[in-house]
Amino acid sequence: MIPHQIGYMPQIEKENKTTKTLNIGLLGVLTKHKGGTIVAELAEKIERENLDVRIKLIGTSCVDINSPVFSQTGAYTRGAIPRLTLENDIDVFLIPSIWPETFSYTTEEIMKMGMPIMCFDIGAPAERVKKYDKGIIIPAISAESVYQTIRDNQIVKESTDKKVNSQKVLFVVQEVTFSSRYRIDHLREQLIRKGISSDCVSIKDTKKCDLKAYNSIVVYRISEYEKLKKLKSKAKKLNMQVFYDIDDYIFNYQAIKDIGFLKGKEYRNYENYTEQIRNCMEICDGYIVSTLSLEKVIKEQFPGKVVVVNRNVASMEMVIASLTVEKVHKDNITIGYFSGTKTHNDDFESIKGELLSVMQENENIHLLVAGQIELPAEFNAVKDQVETFKFVSWQELPHLIAKADINLMPLENSIFHECKSENKWMEAALVNVPTIASRNNELASVIRDGEDGFLCKNSEEWAEKLNKLIRDESLRNQIASSAHARIMKEYMTDDMEMETLRAILK
């Protein structure tokens, strides 16, 4: 018999603790038959005896437990479990079910993460836990027995004996955007995987923050100068550094003014916006950037200040979402372009001739376009081969990208575009789709041409390499497999540039 299986879950390896308490984790929906009464009794004992123990439920409780030692996250997605485990500094998970179950998905998820787990000696989950090297069987079905187990068990002791890291970083944003997920959420995940906790607030709420609780501040694309100036002044009095995180060349209008999308009416005040960004950058102590090209530009324009590169990486939730996608076999070959915003109209325009040519020559070639891009009128001639999607959530994006056989990443030849990161290559590689991209200094420093992607310096190379990928399925699979392996090794949140870490915590 083959037991139930769940998909990929990353291993959780806590380097240290972020709290001084022993934290018992629960996972899922807590009901009476799932052990809710025992959990309530355990919380009562912890509170009554003033024990340094907390109960943290990743999920929701149907049992009313009104205790300061008990907390719940509320509804969660499966992909969020590893991050929530780290953020709540969970030391050991408890499966408190008093009802014999045939299979427990939550037990399997916890074991896949490599976390210690304890349960009562009933049902199929107990059989799995007995065979697990971090499994603990509680001898009696009672709150007292649970407490004695966590007090005396060596596995629990090893988990809680880790050093407590009190370092903490404050992140400040002006608004939440697609980019802020990469630059803030993923950086926060990198930190918590190193055992460093953080908070994130809006710039308008910083006046409520007790800055003494933090070691440093990271602000992302803030343009509100007066508010940032006040925050910087408070930080300076505490001898605390403020870092500006930025992932686009948007602080020197004269250098980028000729870019096509800036001629749109929605960018009429963009020069003023770039000036505000620059003013905010100037009062900060250092910079965190996403690319080597951006690092070079900032070092030239803000000499004497610290600049560190922290490349965009995939969050644990993003990886889980991507690895659950199943490729669907189809007869046609789909070329995908996942642009996001209309700022990429001119990027697409740069390869329209080569793309139209292959589509007109072969009706079996389809184009899948997602985002706000406005397709050139010439594509009306092949409209039956075109499928379009508007914006989708990042959680849905892997499923959409996986529909493609080839991912397009054209970029205009400008310093603005050279400062952009390899996100689109990474997202496609996660779902085993090969990328063909424009060659510039930045992408050439990342993508290995012919090994884990294709780079094109002119229209002739676009035509040649696109046709090569279309004709050769084994080549597509080879490129995709190499890129996927590299992403899984080098682009995870368990990997972080030590230079970035040292700068933030200096």
Q: What do the PLM-derived regions correspond to, one by one?
A:
Residues 95-105, 127, 252, 346-349, ...:
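Nucleotide-sugar-dependent
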Residues 233-237, 250, 266-287:
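Membrane-proximal helix-turn-helix segments that form the acceptor-binding/catalytic region
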Residues 91, 114, 405, 430-433, ...:
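A short alpha->beta transition loop at the rim of the catalytic pocket in nucleotide-sugar-dependent
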Residues 7-78, 171-194, 312-322, 328-403:
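Conserved catalytic-core segment of nucleotide-activated headgroup transferases in glycan assembly
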Residues 148, 152, 158-163, 468, ...:
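A short, well-ordered alpha-helix in the C-terminal region of glycosyltransferases
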Residues 75, 136-143, 153-154, 449-460, ...:
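Conserved acidic donor-binding segment of nucleotide-sugar-dependent glycosyltransferases
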Residues 1-12, 282-299, 303-322:
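Donor nucleotide-sugar binding/catalytic pocket of nucleotide-sugar-dependent glycosyltransferases
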Residues 122-133, 137, 419, 439-450, ...:
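Short acidic/histidine- and often glycine-rich active-site loop of Leloir-type glycosyltransferases
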